[in-house]
Amino acid sequence: MTEPTQLWGGRFKSGPSEALANLSRAPRSYFRLYKEDIAGSRAHASELKRAGVLDESEFSAIRAALEGIEADVGAGREEPIAADEDLHTFLERLLMARLGTLGGKLRAGRSRNDQTANNTRLYLRRMARELSQGVIAIEEALTEQASRHTETVMPGFTHLQPAQPVVLGHHLMAHAQSLLRDLQRFADWDRRFDRSPLGAAALAGSGIARRPDLSAIDLGYSAACENSIDAVAARDHVAEFLFICSLVAVDLSRLAEEICLWSSKQFSWVRLHDSYSTGSSIMPQKKNPDVAELTRGMSGTLIGNIAGFLATMKAMPLAYNRDLAEDKRSLFETIDVLELVLPAFAGMVGTLEFDVEKLREEAPKGFTLATEVADWLVGRDVPFAEAHEITGAVVRFCEERGHDLAGLTAEDLPGIDPRLHPEMLAALVLEKALASRNGYGATAPEKVREQIARFETALAECCAFAGGPIGGGAFAGAKDGAEEARRR
């Protein structure tokens, strides 16, 4: 095994204390960025060749060694040792073992500051696509369920109180719409941070690697960062990514809360599949909504990660500070949580079985059709303020007699208000109430079907992002992009 590599030390008389070394050592989880670090090294090697630091044979040797290192690390044949301070020292140790002093040439003109900034951006651009795929699986499950239930009526709620009847598919698509915006945020994020920090070096820019625009294209970015200080000091790409992930978690948590309620015996609106439920160690009858509960609980962790990271950033002067290393602790936990949650949640949603008859039975309860009374009166030129009062009197009449609107008779109406006629009772039908809500985006069954069709078109755009490459380089197609940049 080769000796550990240290990237600094010439101006020090002694090495770091054991306590400092332990504090400085990167957690093992940080080494997951090895592919991004090696991609950056390949691009930087091209820069050094352009600058005349590497000749053709040296460049080829370094590129070949980097490919071998990537394969060996990926296969588990090479692993960090305790003395490796971080990912950069680990990979340089492996490079030096293969190439000797030639491996040390790769360090010219770059800093760990721009390396780590680049690693994080590349990694997050990849994860934006991978996490999007997980969210899309949930979207597809929601859309399939909604398509099955464009005629299924249920009570809609405000303030957790029965409000108006709605179509179950409409309710499910409301959740799908919020997750769609999260997917669009991932794509927007990617466009905003499609800039390479490589070439910024420590903070002032490199005196050797002077074509960061070319290395940017090698890595799949559209361009290099506009300001070298900002390139190494900025972590708003991390904060925004954490925010998007926390929004995904919150959106899932809201649906999870409903599933917990709806699957309870008090509601019995939905049945959970056995493969996405657990039992009790003492109560044999229990069937618990663990996926929903764990999702709801883990959302708090993700909210805490974005709040904690912003607190770390708030008092940090330019440019790079070691505090910035904390970005990975928050990022990796957030990403790891979502990677566990998303497939489980998609499976749970896709296997839900709704009790259509129970939902229909509950739909008119709690005077959910009261708005139909007010609308019927407005249709007969009664001002809405008065219609509202009359409808309230109708509800009070029913409550005092212990029945819902379905218990009203033609004989009851004149005694409540002379403007109420027997034909009003015909408006108190669930299907009519749904059909009357037929504006754009409303709950009428045909409008829900139209909404689903539009949604599928929008989701296809998100699928194109999730399944697409990172720019034109990074891990493929870099040569053609760089040649085009040289011609420009």
Curated annotation (Swiss-Prot):
Keywords: Amino-acid biosynthesis, Arginine biosynthesis, Cytoplasm, Lyase, Plasmid. SUPFAM superfamilies: L-aspartase-like. Gene3D superfamilies: Fumarase/aspartase (C-terminal domain) (1.10.40.30), Fumarase/aspartase (Central domain) (1.20.200.10), Fumarase/aspartase (N-terminal domain) (1.10.275.10). One of its GO terms (biological process) is L-arginine biosynthetic process. GO terms for cellular component: cytosol. InterPro entries: Arg_succ_lyase_C, Argininosuccinate_lyase, Fumarase/histidase_N, Fumarate_lyase_CS, Fumarate_lyase_fam, Fumarate_lyase_N, L-Aspartase-like. PROSITE patterns: FUMARATE_LYASES. One of its GO terms (molecular function) is argininosuccinate lyase activity. It catalyses: 2-(N(omega)-L-arginino)succinate = fumarate + L-arginine. It is found in: Cytoplasm. Belongs to the lyase 1 family. Argininosuccinate lyase subfamily. This is Argininosuccinate lyase 2. It comes from Rhizobium meliloti (strain 1021) (Ensifer meliloti).
